[in-house]
């Protein structure tokens, strides 16, 4: 059964599709070698990255993430320092610790291939893992796809390839396959839904809020204690990430652009007047009157800079957009009257339901639909969550979510230097405040709106399909080619 909490996974920066996903896929390959008793036969492993993974893989740490996964690491528990330096560590003796069980010869220049002019037809984020024995005979081969938000899907070694700028054949992409499927919730979910229209209708029919409906689905297959524990863990990491980002002693971000960390200086300046991070008192309900935009900017910058630095974060729903939902949730926590832990639960369940619709009916992958699928989806999710905790009806929640995505349609993914820094970090801050403004507009209305969220999601999907590949996480267009890397 699909859980909406899968939209929030604890992992590492800087990218969910280019760091988290490849690590998960590599770990799965290594685990299958272990399960099939093939580790002892394996003398060498080759990693081939295609399309967007190849074009921006160095900046996103895709190579390092895949190597860490082959060694048996997972994003939620990997030592971030070890992952950051794994290439240098392996180079010390030219070995890699396969599945944590056997040291095999590993020559980075030979065994990591960036295939920049080809991509898999099914998805631009394809990768191939090959294990060979001492005689160079193939032991095992797997193809995997990182489909956004840290989610992966297994392919087949014979999956077709196309040129990097070619349009995939009709029906070849995973987004098409997902759209045609029935439901991801399974028969045990009491309230399955595949569109926002269905979701709001179910809420109205059963007199439930979106969060209450989602809670019923989540607890149909596991205990409420387990669900609450997962939510608490997500919130705990989000809070720690904001705190770390605000107090970091590192002056610049890694990667070569020398982008300064601004959150610590901004925090000191704001805290000199009133340090909201170090107190529990709330101000009056500020949603309709004041956005406290500077603090929201700070929260988003803090998380985004932690992500860019390879720190521990929550994918929400992607790493490139990971600052938006924590920023808006911190806004609720610090600035809204009567904010409480149950409100955090309501916020995340509601936001997760909206994120599920984006993933199911379009894509949350920047390599597939551009940044509208990452920042746009997160803005919509954050708006929905905030609208829910300030008393919005399901119709007002949908309205806020629709406003959040409508004004991010067409947003390109053009990271300078292939790094999740420019324009990604500032873009998170802008979108966080946009989400709050979307809630303000929705709450001043009665929930009626002309454009539905389902229509906006479909529009995002179509826009992404029409978008040129150079604007979809390849660093071959936009700011990526107009800003000189110094």
Report residues per predicted region.
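Active-site-proximal binding-pocket segments
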Residues: 339-347, 354-381, 386-403, 413
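Short, mixed-charge aromatic SLiMs
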Residues: 44-57, 89-97, 349-361, 402-415, ...
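Conserved phosphate/anionic-ligand binding catalytic regions in large, soluble enzymes, centered on
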Residues: 8-26, 309-328, 371-379
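C-terminal regulatory domains involved in ligand/effector binding and gene-expression control
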Residues: 75-283
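Accessory "access/gating" subregions that flank catalytic or transport cores
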Residues: 221-370, 478-486
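Alpha-helical support elements that line or immediately flank enzyme active sites
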Residues: 17-34, 326-338, 383-391
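Functionally critical mobile loop/hinge segments
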Residues: 49, 386-486
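Non-transmembrane, aqueous-exposed alpha-helical and coiled segments at domain scale
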Residues: 2-12, 23-49, 60, 74, ...
